[in-house]
From Swiss-Prot:
Region: Disordered, residue numbers: 1-20, 310-345, 706-732
GO CC annotation: centrosome; cleavage furrow; cytoplasm; nucleus
Name assigned to this protein: Serine/threonine-protein kinase greatwall
Family stated for the protein in its record: Belongs to the protein kinase superfamily. AGC Ser/Thr protein kinase family.
High-level lineage: Eukaryota, Metazoa, Chordata, Craniata, Vertebrata
Disulphide bridges: none
Amino acid sequence: MSTVEPLSDEGVAAGPRRIEVPRPPSIEEFTIVKPISRGAFGKVYLGRKAGRLYAVKVMKKADMINKNMVHQVQAERDALALSKSPFIVHLYYSLQSANNVYLVMEYLIGGDVKSLLHIYGYFDEEMAVKYISEAALALDYLHRHGIIHRDLKPDNMLISNQGHIKLTDFGLSRVTLNREINMIDILTTPSMAKPKHDYSRTPGQLLSLISSLGFYTPVGMKMPINPNSGGASDSLHEVISPLSMIEKENTPLSTKLFKTGLDTSPLTPVMPVRSLTPALLQSRERFGASTASSQSCMYLSSMESECCSSPRLEKDVKQTEDEMCSTGTSNSRPPLPSSREVLNSKDPKVLKKELESAISPISSNDCGSRQKLGTERSEITDTPVTTLDTKGIVRKCLSENKIWEEKLVARREMTNEMLETASSQQSPLFLKDPVQPVKEEEIFEKPGVKRSFELVDTSPCQELNYVKKTNAEYKRGCWISELSASKSTGLTTEIQSLMLSGEICESKEIMRCIDRQQTEKPLVPTVAKNLLCDLDADHEKDKEYMNSSLLCADDEKPLGALSADSDLSFPETSVSESHLEKQLVDLDKGVKDLSFEEPKAEDLLTMSPNCQEASRNGVEADVVQNCTMLCCEQDNHQKHTEETDTISSPSEKMTETVHLFRKNNVVFRSYNSPINVSNVSDPCSMASLDIMDLSPACSGSYPTAITPLQKTPRQGDAGTPYRTPKSVRRGAAPVEGERILGTPDYLAPELLLTKPHGSAVDWWALGVCLFEFLTGIPPFNDETPAQVFQNILKRDIPWPEGEEKLSDNAQNAIDILLTFDSTKRAGLKELKHHPLFHGVDWDNLQNQPMPFIPQPDDETDTSYFEARNNAQHLTVSGFSL
């Protein structure tokens, strides 16, 4: 037996009643009729919605961000939303899209007072007094509610249909409400006494006025004020999803990518801001916790590290890597070979083509259809990013594989000849400790940071990376040998014998030195294509190399303390290279800074021009003193080394000067930065801190590889920072150094003098407007803004004379408004008692007849704005937003 649902009076089955939730309208609901005017920060259009006309002010978010005016847009919206006065333009809606902010206000058909002034030439005294009186009431209302206009001028005074004045354009205003406005602020804003007009707002208007303006919303994301536009959501989803252009049927995967990759707050800065936290956490996870991992681990390049710093792009990289891993697993492919094997075994062109196809999301060699690609993409898992071998190889091969391959062969032959010549030198130290041959692959195994041609594959940062990635046992953690140069009294600083002690790593330094001196190095640091370019991930193959490493991860800590406070640091880098640089000072690795023509006894020790200039400027004395500290510390461990006087020997002095300059060449690295590492156990840390204000330009003949950013300037001896430290202290905030905002002719002197200012700046501007109404020209007008500012500071007012002379009351009213001392400047109270405003009915101004009442041809007539536009050569015929 069936049951019949009870019906309502209309004959419809009774059920739960749906209550429509109020929501703000969309900007699509407004129809643009014509443009009205254009200002410094936006354009004003005449719009229509439901048969009613509005003035729509359009401001581009990108322009507001570029001009650093984001907070001013918020202030303008708040000031208009809080105001309920017959002398202030009424704001109905505050809307926004992905690119623009829209302020929907009432349309005043009479135009602005500036246009009327251009037509009249100047106003008579009665007309000027009425306009100034209504503007004074508007200013008093704003000041009582904590709002300072700061841009009062005839251009921002609009004429209503009845001829009354209404202030507009609060783009430079200041709202003392130190929080976002809420519903209570708008509902309980007091209005004028017994107004005839109702200033109530609809729920949709209230919601739009208290909504947050998202200036950093991701591109294409749906704005919070328009939650019910389903069609727009679908279209935006298609634009953003990377898979929508490939396979639109794959809805679950597209939805997953959309939610995970772009699930951010509307106010989250995604594109213009770089987040450093993910990169630092990944750095700790990879290199900081353990060194026992023997897995192949590739480093990100500088461009890739930036991508991973962004939450959105990081997830894209993650899914791409997971896709590659899943594809390789499903096809049972063998693991990728190491980067050295790939680079040495294949032709560069073939290698480039294969690697491009391997890293590309859409492989050109894949004979499958789009459906197959979608199936593979559906296998994406949520495993973290493990390796970037293929991506790192592609980045390297695309940038320098051709040049590196061509020059590598020639450099190998040249180095072999130089090595034989250097090995033939018979010194006591060589006889005592013969040099062991070095494998070519240990020297040419990685191109390294591309500082210059000679330094392509000899980056000192490689040794630090090996330390972090190996658990090999170190044998040289106790004492280190020292370069002992022969004494010489010649002025040419000759090196009579080059004595080196050593192991494989020391002969490796000889070869590096020989390679580096074949070409004159530029003084300007070259740009590094990749700050993190260690392409070789085959750790097991280099066990012997790592066993002979000069660095001990347990005993020799990096100079972590310098990474935060050192003014020698370059942008986008870390102090990890200084870990290796310390060893270069203590050891005989300083020979890499010497210039060699031929490896003979009569070679000359030369310094780079930068270092020579530093010596002439008196830097050498401090360096020598610090050299003594280093040598004394090393002599305690070396009994077989003869004592040398560093002060009396020019050769030794310059050698150690080069050492210290080499050490202080601190280069930051963006991804492998040791974060919480102490430098207490460093034997040379104190001496290095004493000379940290040496210029990084004095780096010997070893040019520094830095990013294409500005180098940090030389820090003075006083230690004064070039930028004020960020304020994290408690207590009262310091006085903010504000910019000078406004139109030059109407600026108060305290604004020009960058003094703290208040509501008195508006009364000064009102005095300027009164003078302009009576004369047709602002009192401080001149040819250039600089001359206008001088006239304001001198209070140079050209009073009319003869028949054009102003009345005494008018001149006195202007004087009290243009008082230089802001504390003695007149306000509404003084104007009410002034003789010029004697017959003004202040309590009933909005009902008084006005001298000018606009007579438009129709409701869409904008001709009253044309006079000002023509005077300022503004063309508003276009509809471009």
